[in-house]
A protein has these predicted regions:
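Acidic (Asp/Glu-rich) sequence patches and key acidic residues
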Residues: 1-199
């Protein structure tokens, strides 16, 4: 699961062509493999066609755009966090690219990346402690029920309530990486996409 951004009017290099879609039911594995190779090459040659991030990588990038891009409306900011197919114009894409480019060139960019890595490391250490508590609680549930395969939803009520409280202590910062490399790739896409949709 993730976020797929498609260029509306991407710049296409001369001589570049998109492979025709295959009939998956009638194609051999070799034909499918070749199709993916050609599709990947087409997207690499034409960076404005497609940009993808898994949900974990997209959230920090979209948050950065929302934080820095005062020119975006609340609606535009909101739809960055949704894959409903909202469209952003070419002018908007270029403004976002300019804003992110200025950020990347600033000392703040490296600091942001380093601070995010520290926060992830701290959250990861915290989550290990939370997971240890959950593991201990699981042993209690097994001892009471004599069911070594018991899932938390089937714990006795008092243990299930305790599991819910402990699980809520997880710090999800550990799950959302931020990398300047990703920001730079997004800038390339924005400059070449001719406007984009978020799906």
């Amino acid at each position: 699961m993730g976020f797929d951004l498609y260029g509306i009017k991407p710049k296409i290099k001369k001589g570049s062509y998109k492979p025709p879609v295959l009939d998956w039911n009638k194609s051999t594995e070799a034909e499918k493999k070749k199709y993916f190779e050609l599709s990947n090459q087409y997207e690499a040659d034409n960076v404005g066609v497609y940009f993808r991030n898994n949900v974990w990588g997209w959230r920090p990038l979209a948050d950065l755009v929302c934080k820095l891009c005062d020119h975006l409306t609340d609606k535009q900011k909101s739809f960055l966090q949704s894959n409903d197919g909202y469209e952003y114009s070419e002018a908007t894409a270029l403004k976002i690219a300019d804003t992110l480019e200025a950020f990347v060139k600033s000392p703040q960019a490296k600091r942001t990346e380093q601070e995010h890595k520290k926060a992830m490391k701290k959250a990861d250490a915290h989550n290990k402690k939370v997971n240890n508590k959950l593991d201990a609680l699981r042993m209690d549930a097994i001892a009471i029920t004599n069911n070594k395969d018991i899932a938390p939803r089937d714990y006795p009520k008092d243990l299930k309530d305790k599991w819910d409280r402990i699980y809520a202590e997880h710090d999800h910062t550990a799950s959302y990486p931020f990398a300047l490399k990703n920001v730079k790739e997004f800038i390339k896409f924005l400059r070449e996409c001719g406007g984009f949709t978020v799906c």
